[in-house]
Amino acid sequence: MSIHQVMRYLPHRYPFLLVDRVTDFKPGEYLEAIKNVSINEPYFQGHFPIRPVMPGVLIMEALAQATGLLAFKTEEARNENQDKQQLYLFVGIDEARFRRQVEPGDQLHLRVELLRVVRGIWRFKAEARVNGDLVASATLMCAGKEIES
């Protein structure tokens, strides 16, 4: 899924769109995506000027955006909510862990797996890797919200 297709599903735009491409997915199961981390990212001006590091909360946000994409693709495959405009909102995070810093030039590989959906709350296992090394992980939750045009 190209960036143009990603933008059809996610409402985020620069500088807050944190998924550059979806490399693989299976509706109802998993989604894999990448975020290319560039020195031109606006947050590097202040985090940290001497040694730029991607903020951990933005790594989690990138993973959360990937969960939204998987939720959209899953509902699309099930032919659910096709006639409604919907957003997936980030509603929870458990067991977040950060294992190493992400720096300019890194390519962040995102993988989210759907664990279950209970009463409209989608629960995912989420991992971010750089060069195969785990840099962050968490259990993330999102919920669909119908929006009016």
Swiss-Prot record:
Q: What is this protein called?
A: 3-hydroxyacyl-[acyl-carrier-protein] dehydratase FabZ
Record has Glycoprotein as a keyword: no
Where's the active site on this chain? H47
Family of this protein = Belongs to the thioester dehydratase family. FabZ subfamily.
Q: Which NCBIfam families match?
A: fabZ (TIGR01750), PRK00006.1 (NF000582)
Gene3D superfamilies registered for this protein in UniProt = Hotdog Thioesterase
| Purpose of the protein | Involved in unsaturated fatty acids biosynthesis. Catalyzes the dehydration of short chain beta-hydroxyacyl-ACPs and long chain saturated and unsaturated beta-hydroxyacyl-ACPs.
Which GO MF term does the entry hold, naming one?
Answer: (3R)-hydroxyacyl-[acyl-carrier-protein] dehydratase activity
Biological process terms in GO annotation:
fatty acid biosynthetic process; lipid A biosynthetic process
Which CDD domains does the annotation name?
A: FabZ
